[in-house]
């Protein structure tokens, strides 16, 4: 073990146990760590060189384990696992937290006008569609027409629900402030979650129709599976809903408690920075937790796949009982 009680780097094993939720949570805390956004081209190049030298047996893994883990963290948060190319900085998962703090603050603005509501829903879905596209499974190829259709659908759903539900809550004219506030809090959550799920289903729908690459434990790709594609898309859609739940519902509740304090009443200008801090704190925990619900490299039983994958043998002549696929983010 290293000085930080991490396993000695071996280039194969994970820093944390990806078989457990907590292990995956710790792993995605690394991947979503905004500090990796400050990694320079030089840092990226040095990280690649260090790991390449390790593979060649030129680096002592015991002596340089911490440096190797740091290099892997930089690459994992920057490089797409399928293409091996850097993901455009704003659309890396590590950028999701700082960017969405601002977006969430806009989505839950109290007494927002219809124009403001539409604007923030549009901004949110525009960012989500770009994030989905940048982090999709590499075997997912979409035409510009399909991307535009997905984008228009997601924006249309989110804006329609946000405006329609907001109008509906106002028309109900509920006198009980607690119930009225609760319903108002549900409006952005329902709109964002519904559109987010639709966004994933539309953007990655061809993965369910055409399938995604599946491989064995040795990394050998054995073809495309529609069942694996469905599994990947459903898992990501569920994770997106899980991300929205705490990020959009908890901040108004927490801020409601702060609003009652004498400090906030005395200094009302602290409300916005305090609101942003609350959203950031919640996102910092909820984002990696939601992504960690399912492993990035998920496994699926051969029996759950199409018939042609049920009697395939690996390089040692053994029938493959379990395949691996990249579920994407």
UniProtKB/Swiss-Prot annotation:
Classification via InterPro entries: Mtc
Protein family per UniProt: Belongs to the sideroflexin family.
Membrane topology of the entry: Multi-pass membrane protein
GO biological process: amino acid transport; mitochondrial transmembrane transport
A single GO molecular function term of this UniProt record: monoatomic ion transmembrane transporter activity
Domain of life: Eukaryota
Biological role stated in the UniProt entry: Mitochondrial amino-acid transporter that mediates transport of serine into mitochondria.
Annotated localization: Mitochondrion membrane
Keywords assigned by UniProt, alphabetized: Amino-acid transport, Membrane, Mitochondrion, Transmembrane, Transmembrane helix, Transport
Residues passing through the membrane, by range: 95-115, 147-167, 183-203, 238-258, 274-294
Taxonomic lineage of the native organism: Eukaryota, Amoebozoa, Evosea, Eumycetozoa, Dictyostelia
Protein's recorded name: Sideroflexin
Organism listed in the record: Dictyostelium discoideum (Social amoeba)
Gene expressing this chain: sfxn
Cellular component terms per the entry's GO annotation: mitochondrial inner membrane
Keyword Transmembrane helix recorded: yes
Keyword Transmembrane helix tagged: yes
């Amino acid at each position: 073990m290293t000085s930080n009680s991490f396993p000695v780097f071996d280039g194969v094993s994970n820093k944390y146990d990806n078989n457990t939720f907590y292990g995956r949570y710790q792993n995605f805390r690394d991947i979503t760590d905004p500090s990796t956004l400050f990694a320079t081209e030089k840092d990226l190049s040095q990280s690649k060189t260090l790991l390449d030298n390790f593979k060649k047996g030129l680096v002592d893994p015991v002596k340089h384990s911490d440096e190797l883990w740091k290099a892997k963290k930089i690459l994992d948060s920057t490089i797409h696992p399928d293409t091996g190319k850097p993901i455009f900085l704003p659309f890396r998962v590590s950028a999701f937290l700082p960017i969405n703090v601002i977006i969430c603050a806009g989505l839950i603005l109290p007494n927002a006008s219809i124009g403001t509501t539409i604007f923030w829903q549009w901004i949110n879905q525009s960012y989500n569609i770009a994030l989905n596209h940048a982090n999709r499974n590499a075997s997912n190829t979409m035409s510009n027409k399909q991307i535009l259709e997905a984008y228009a659908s997601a924006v249309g759903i989110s804006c329609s629900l946000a405006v329609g539900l907001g109008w509906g809550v106002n028309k109900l004219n509920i006198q009980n402030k607690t119930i009225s506030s609760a319903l108002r809090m549900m409006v952005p959550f329902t709109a964002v979650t519904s559109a987010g799920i639709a966004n994933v289903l539309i953007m990655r729908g061809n993965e369910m129709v055409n399938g995604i690459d599946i491989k064995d434990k040795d990394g050998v790709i054995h073809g495309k599976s529609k069942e694996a594609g469905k599994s990947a898309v459903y898992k990501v859609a569920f994770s997106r809903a899980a991300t929205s739940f705490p990020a959009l519902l908890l901040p108004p509740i927490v801020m409601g408690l702060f609003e009652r304090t004498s400090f906030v009443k005395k200094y009302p200008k602290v409300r916005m920075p305090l609101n942003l801090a609350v959203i950031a704190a919640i996102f910092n925990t909820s984002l990696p937790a939601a992504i960690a619900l399912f492993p990035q490299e998920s496994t699926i039983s051969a029996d759950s796949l199409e018939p042609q994958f049920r009697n395939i043998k690996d390089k040692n002549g053994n029938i493959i009982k379990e395949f691996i696929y990249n579920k994407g983010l």
